[in-house]
Amino acid sequence: MFLQLFNIVLIYGVRTSQSTWINYPENCTSISLQDGLRELCGGDQLMNIRNQLLDDTYKEIGEICTPNYSMEKKSEGYRCASIKKKVICKMLENFDHEVTYISESHPIDKAKCHELIINKDLLNNIEEPYYPPPKCDSSKSSVSELEFIKLINYDVILDPVGFQNEDNYLFQFDKTNPIPIDYIYQSEFCQSKNWICHGDKSYIPLEIFKGDNQASIRLELIKLSIIYDSNFGELPIRDACRLHYCGKPAIKLFNGAIIKIKESPIVLGLPSCNRSRIEMPETNLAKKRYSNVGPVLLTTLNKRFELCKKIKKNLELKQPIPINNLHYLAPFEPGKHPALVYRLVSTTINQSLRNKVVPVSMLSMSMCEYITGQIIEDGIKRNLTDEDTVIILANNKEIKWKDLKGRENWYQEQANPNIIDKNPDHLSYYWYNGVMRREDKFTYPSRYILQTLKKIYTDTERESRISFFKFRLERNITKTEVIKFRDIEESSDQDHSQSVNKTLEGDDYWNWVEETTSDKNKTDGSRGDEKQTIQNKEYWNEESSIWGISTIITVLGIYYIYRKNRREKIFLNMKHRVQRFFKLDY
């Protein structure tokens, strides 16, 4: 949940999900550009989470485990039974004898069985039950009866939650020790060694992405959720309860998932599960619901890191940087990291921000404490009001529209009078890491990794309609508009602003920014290896490529001229011109 990489807004976001995970900067203080550059890209490591809260709480939680539902639930062992053999002899009217044989078996409770095994050595003193000889009397029916205590081998599948009942037990025996061993919890499913566990390594280790280990990804996100719940929530783990599972203490989460963590005050503060929670269907965290998503995430991490280092190198060399590529420098981990803001952005007639280049002298750096949160997307509204809640952080802090607008370091773009001369209200304001607002709406760049992790975590959460952070806000939230662009092409020119507004007026807004869920097993692939010629011509574009209408028209025009001139026998001259055109840099 805390890996924030890409500047793309996923147009395949879940239709039922009403929020976008973000990494929000707070408590920012200005630092020099030189100091900020040293901290960019996480220093010299792929992941760099510096957060005292996480440092302290991770050790308290320790290892987190969940059942492996592919394991066999069958248990095999011994139980005691009282077996009665009866023989009834009755004389008939013709003076014949009718003999009836009856066998009865009655279970013996666990404590009594344990005592009998030790006192009577049932394991070695094996006696097969047999019927006594009939005793027939001429005057009345007679009954002969024998009772035997026997160990019976059982092969059963028992409910992992129902083991508290004394009638449910199985014993096994060590060859060197006649004392019975409680074995009901020893099915493959219940054995702790077969559970899927995520170690107490600090933070999200890169190993969880190898081999497409979606269970470890979910466990890590649950672990991070527990950290925030235990520090900021009303309960140590929100909407969770304690129960005995496979005979050991466990926790049932709000979505039915079963987990085990180290005994600590976090666990002891939970209530016991009532019957309805016990009977609630379980969620299999180990189920692989997406194909090959782990390696894609790992590849994305590495490519993002390499791209970030290239941009950082250009900044250190005082070279100007295309404005949209600066978003790649935004930190993707919580904790203390730099934030970048551009103090001056000029309005251009170009439709895409890709053509805007920001000089290094126009960049400012701040050191901020990042905390994970989510943007509230509860519908569409033309204008945000000051009291509208637009962001809720993991510590339950609300960020209202007036709070966001009142933050430091908002810079208004510089108007070009040849483009915008009558309505300066349509100018954009730029903030940290590419956050932008125009009039009473704002854009917050989303990240591919964050939203992919959200999908993995919330794929079972949707059914319960409970948000990941489980906020304690029981009230209706005023519907607000949060505009998200596919390729962060939030151009500040007037024409593009009008086209965006027209788009939002239609009924296809949700189809634009969200996905359909018709195929839950659809592969979440990478964004491809598209090349983008910028500065050193080695930048890898992590975003979705979107061609504007003007670009398409330009290409078609070039193609038309190319065909026309080829017919006119001046092909080589035209080929040279086309090559020169495409070699132009930004």
UniProtKB/Swiss-Prot annotation:
Keyword DNA-binding in the entry? The reply is no
Give the main localization category.
Answer: host cell
**Topology with regard to the membrane?**
Single-pass type I membrane protein
InterPro entries the record matches: Rhabdo_glycop_FD
Which locations, inside or outside the cell, does it occupy? Answer: Host membrane
Q: Where is the signal peptide?
A: 1-14
Any GO CC annotation of this UniProt entry: viral envelope
- Which residues does the entry place in the Cytoplasmic compartment? 563-586
The entry annotates sugar attachment on 27, 68, 274, 350, 383, 476, 501, 521
Bilayer-spanning residue ranges: 545-562
Q: Which Pfam families does UniProt cross-reference here?
A: Rhabdo_glycop_FD
Domain of life of the organism in this record? Answer: Viruses
Q: Which residues lie on this side of the membrane: Extracellular?
A: 15-544
What keywords would UniProt list here? Answer: Glycoprotein, Host membrane, Membrane, Signal, Transmembrane, Transmembrane helix
Family statement drawn from the similarity comment of this UniProt entry = Belongs to the ephemerovirus glycoprotein family.
**This protein is called what?**
Non-structural glycoprotein GNS
Tell me the organism. Answer: Bovine ephemeral fever virus (strain BB7721)
Taxonomic lineage of the native organism: Viruses, Riboviria, Orthornavirae, Negarnaviricota, Haploviricotina
